[in-house]
Amino acid sequence: MKSSGPVERLLRALGRRDSSRAASRPRKAEPHSFREKVFRKKPPVCAVCKVTIDGTGVSCRVCKVATHRKCEAKVTSACQALPPVELRRNTAPVRRIEHLGSTKSLNHSKQRSTLPRSFSLDPLMERRWDLDLTYVTERILAAAFPARPDEQRHRGHLRELAHVLQSKHRDKYLLFNLSEKRHDLTRLNPKVQDFGWPELHAPPLDKLCSICKAMETWLSADPQHVVVLYCKGNKGKLGVIVSAYMHYSKISAGADQALATLTMRKFCEDKVATELQPSQRRYISYFSGLLSGSIRMNSSPLFLHYVLIPMLPAFEPGTGFQPFLKIYQSMQLVYTSGVYHIAGPGPQQLCISLEPALLLKGDVMVTCYHKGGRGTDRTLVFRVQFHTCTIHGPQLTFPKDQLDEAWTDERFPFQASVEFVFSSSPEKIKGSTPRNDPSVSVDYNTTEPAVRWDSYENFNQHHEDSVDGSLTHTRGPLDGSPYAQVQRPPRQTPPAPSPEPPPPPMLSVSSDSGHSSTLTTEPAAESPGRPPPTAAERQELDRLLGGCGVASGGRGAGRETAILDDEEQPTVGGGPHLGVYPGHRPGLSRHCSCRQGYREPCGVPNGGYYRPEGTLERRRLAYGGYEGSPQGYAEASMEKRRLCRSLSEGLYPYPPEMGKPATGDFGYRAPGYREVVILEDPGLPALYPCPACEEKLALPTAALYGLRLEREAGEGWASEAGKPLLHPVRPGHPLPLLLPACGHHHAPMPDYSCLKPPKAGEEGHEGCSYTMCPEGRYGHPGYPALVTYSYGGAVPSYCPAYGRVPHSCGSPGEGRGYPSPGAHSPRAGSISPGSPPYPQSRKLSYEIPTEEGGDRYPLPGHLASAGPLASAESLEPVSWREGPSGHSTLPRSPRDAPCSASSELSGPSTPLHTSSPVQGKESTRRQDTRSPTSAPTQRLSPGEALPPVSQAGTGKAPELPSGSGPEPLAPSPVSPTFPPSSPSDWPQERSPGGHSDGASPRSPVPTTLPGLRHAPWQGPRGPPDSPDGSPLTPVPSQMPWLVASPEPPQSSPTPAFPLAASYDTNGLSQPPLPEKRHLPGPGQQPGPWGPEQASSPARGISHHVTFAPLLSDNVPQTPEPPTQESQSNVKFVQDTSKFWYKPHLSRDQAIALLKDKDPGAFLIRDSHSFQGAYGLALKVATPPPSAQPWKGDPVEQLVRHFLIETGPKGVKIKGCPSEPYFGSLSALVSQHSISPISLPCCLRIPSKDPLEETPEAPVPTNMSTAADLLRQGAACSVLYLTSVETESLTGPQAVARASSAALSCSPRPTPAVVHFKVSAQGITLTDNQRKLFFRRHYPVNSITFSSTDPQDRRWTNPDGTTSKIFGFVAKKPGSPWENVCHLFAELDPDQPAGAIVTFITKVLLGQRK
């Protein structure tokens, strides 16, 4: 039967003459029938020259093709009649515009299709499409583009899309870019937000929350607002966002939202359900479960021990199965396994063991690759993404249908699964552990690109449409192949038209108002805009999303607790515009910290911007400094994008010196560390708390959980004397890129820096020096005033105009490694009591109050019901993750922050014995001090000691003191050689009265080797106006102690490396006690001895130098009267946090400080066992009755340890229900100083720093400083072995991998004798014989780690002797994420590897923290 009507026309359009499935024949091409036409309303584009036809042109009567009159003869396309009008919609071969929930076509056609709703031409269109624009709802549009379109056509379609959106919605639409950033998106659309993530992946959970919150904020601000979701490639991203927002909007949905929810569900089922990956479905389920409360959130970190994957022997014919794993945390690579090889038929399951266990928290992605037989390619076996907040057991299993890539791979068995084994501790799991078959071998030494590539390191690092005239490429593959993709820019790019002028403010929401289910010809009435959610709905949303990192105007749960209360910033309200576009995310801020749980938002001050989640921001100094690039290091390397993410984010104020940031300065960033912003500048606008906080400020201390930081009067940094400038920051997981080389080297004012090449005839040919002299308004106690660095041995100059001697910015080093049995050096005569090494087998434990069992203290009657104190639980011993390669990129306290008020030079707490031969000739330089009145310099003879320098900055000419040189001491049997250092030129100033104001009667106890004598120091004679014979007593309250002893002289261009008294096999020792440097008040002067001051020892005399922990330089000259406990108030608690919070203190150090104190004395430190928690060490009167027998000092048993856990509500002592949450550590300390609650006794708040309470000691002879060693540098000759690329790996594992590669390669590398020099600028290698190279320099900011081989392997020399192997890890030039380990072996027995490594780690790397 012959068809008629619409069906006949449909079949004709499809090229079929009847209803049978006969093959269609091509129609005969017919000539065009052109006629002249004037184009007025919408001029088309010429079909030949692609230029818009302005005015008159020609148009074909049949096919409607348009062209210029002059181009008419050049038309080559055939003329074919268009299909009927009712069938034209959804059949265009180029782009498809579809309306779900709408019945009108985009061109306002009144004609409607009579086809049934179920009929679809989608299968015909899947072959070729360039744009798929779908109205998901009336206010949510989805714009999808193919993955790899022609770039020029793609730009044209983007312009058409922008034109359509502008014509329909004007500036009322907000475009969410879910793919890589593009310049033209920002250029063509008024408001764009970038929330991109890699294709076929699930977005981070907090990013999912952020997108939904931003959509909600935009749509609720104005009923006419529209959201456009832009996606390029797989449409699964659209499904993830639409599904997530569907669940999000149901929280506060009304009756008018039911239809929108239905259409969103219909879109997901019909359009994107088949394109969703298993991980994307999993994250949608996570999001829905967290919103509904069906998923209980687990906020504790997990340690991954094993990954069990199935064996796939037939994965690649001829090659077998060679898998390896890559583990990412928040899209940053944290682990790469070795390549596993299976010989013959092996077991059904392969066990990949992670040693040590890998700490994971947050979004985790595990990818398994198969290394190809040729070794140059790799194939993705499976990929799985999950979030640790949803894991509540020790095992996590994923079957095949939940594994990305594997779920559609027939080579992956249907019954196979992937299993992860976790625990809450890094210790090995006891009991039966999975083991591999003996036929399984592992290759850890591979350096092939297929294994090393990190496919995600360059995502969103640049704009996708960036064209700079050169080849654009990605350094790593994005599809699993080992090769980068190179794209040539188009030869001719048409100019992008400028956006249309802003339209009138009032327009209709949309012309698409009727819903397709009605099938009516008349549009229905417009649905009113959604009202903004009520306060109750917002609170409910906050409660549900509290743990996800984003709340409805509140701060997330991931933010760590501050030592001092935050001056919280209020939230943004939903208004007609958000003021953060383009490029920034709206509506995400922090709550005031006054209330527990989830609170309502407060008002917001002006002048802030939101730092979007999942973005990478170029770091700026909040106090007005600027990033600078050191000499000899490219600026691009200085601005390495440090991947950071925080589960909480808030409003950031613009520093006054910077102004508003430029748009588009954000890229993708993966999590790792919490952001810290300094808000102490008095010039910043005040941030007011909510009214409830202001009322609580008037309450007594005991009633406050959140305490406010009071400011003192003053100017500049002196007004903040003694106050922490940063809140403590908690790293969430171990990362391989850890030291400030990742973009944290800041110069105060690069505008004032100048490069000075070496003058003719001067030494220092190894590099040129540079000078920085910032203005006073950029002053910071931790920054140099005028510091001259040089590769040679230049002496820093002093800038009297700046009023401050240069300070080195240092912090306690945290170098630790794997101690090996019997690895102590013969020189290790003693160990500093300040930093005892951890015994290998010792377990650490905390006392956690619980309801039943464990250690019990007799409690007062009114506290008896609170529950006894619980037994201690065993924790892990300290591992290498706590060292420089562990968690310490950002400072944990105000005292060791980068560029903070720290003057410590990171001298080791164990004795550092210096052997420094120096030639007699001078090698110093003079630098311009830029003083209003040039201060004359004083030349000291080698026999004179350098007098102290006044820091008053008055420019007064100094009086030249006279005196004898230092007295020699008796020889020490263990002292290595130390020839004299070179003389120095110093501008000298003397304070009135003959000696400096800051001298303190208290002094630290030097830690020396047994048998080393201490002689009284005979300083220079007093000046004429002081009593005769009274020396200027230089008590270095902030400098290391030095003890001298004579040795036969030696001669060498630079000092040798100081020999450490005690170091492990990898050359690293325990961190010193953290220093406390208090800024002087407006009327005070700092201590008399700056870091750069030192006496110049006499020629021919060697000196034995010993460093001790650094102490405060703000010691009062007269002791203050004791403060009564009852007089404590808010300000007192805030000001004393520097006395009891010691972040880098070890447990043994805390015991040593507290064991001689009265009961109630306490210290709080960062927990090394539980990341993000604190440890409370408390001295008690008697041990608990159930305490275990103690073999050591019984006094040490009186120091008990408690764990302070952190959470969304604040901090609390773990294990006791009666313990409330406190807004800060200060609040917790204040309350427990009044009432012990669950503690054995009340806390006694100290009135002074316990590190300063040391007995007086004789002043050692010949004061010298670590700064002298840095200026002169230390050098020796070593054997250079090789350099091994370690991808993103650093720390001891990088050195171990490089050592394994060097020792296993055949033939072994030929060593070369090189001159190894360490100075303030970095490490310089000079091959005197020029066999391998001439000279190589590694700037200090590129060096991330240094140690000896953790496995204590040795290099075998040709004569049969062996030498210890050591190395340092530095950034690979031109690659911000890859590292290279440079390997060496000892050459001179007097310069052991441990001494070199200790010098690098403790002095060189520590001075820039």
From Swiss-Prot:
Family per similarity comment: Belongs to the PTEN phosphatase protein family.
Boundaries of every SH2 domain copy: 1140-1247
Outcome of swapping K1212Q: Does not affect affinity for PtdIns(3,4,5)P3
Modification(s) after translation: Ubiquitinated following sequestration in cytoplasmic aggregates with SQSTM1, leading to proteasomal degradation.
Cellular component GO terms held in the UniProt record: cytoplasm; focal adhesion; plasma membrane
Induction line: By high glucose levels in differentiated podocytes (at protein level).
Post-translational modification Phosphothreonine, affected residues: T91, T474, T910, T977, T1182
Residue intervals of the PTB domain: 1275-1408
Domain of life: Eukaryota
Full protein name: Tensin-2
Region described as Disordered: 1-35, 462-536, 562-582, 812-1098, 1111-1130
Zinc finger (Phorbol-ester/DAG-type): 31-79
Function: Tyrosine-protein phosphatase which regulates cell motility, proliferation and muscle-response to insulin. Phosphatase activity is mediated by binding to phosphatidylinositol-3,4,5-triphosphate (PtdIns(3,4,5)P3) via the SH2 domain. In muscles and under catabolic conditions, dephosphorylates IRS1 leading to its degradation and muscle atrophy. Negatively regulates PI3K-AKT pathway activation. Dephosphorylates nephrin NPHS1 in podocytes which regulates activity of the mTORC1 complex.
PROSITE patterns: C2_TENSIN, PPASE_TENSIN, SH2, ZF_DAG_PE_1, ZF_DAG_PE_2
CDD domains assigned to the protein according to its UniProt record, in alphabetical order: C1_TNS2 (cd20887), PTB_tensin (cd01213), PTP_tensin-2 (cd14562), SH2_Tensin_like (cd09927)
Gene source species: Homo sapiens (Human)
Bias type Pro residues, positions: 491-506, 968-982, 1046-1056
Gene Ontology biological process: cellular homeostasis; collagen metabolic process; kidney development; multicellular organism growth; multicellular organismal-level homeostasis; negative regulation of cell population proliferation; negative regulation of insulin receptor signaling pathway; peptidyl-tyrosine dephosphorylation
UniProt feature, compositional bias: Polar residues: 900-918, 930-940
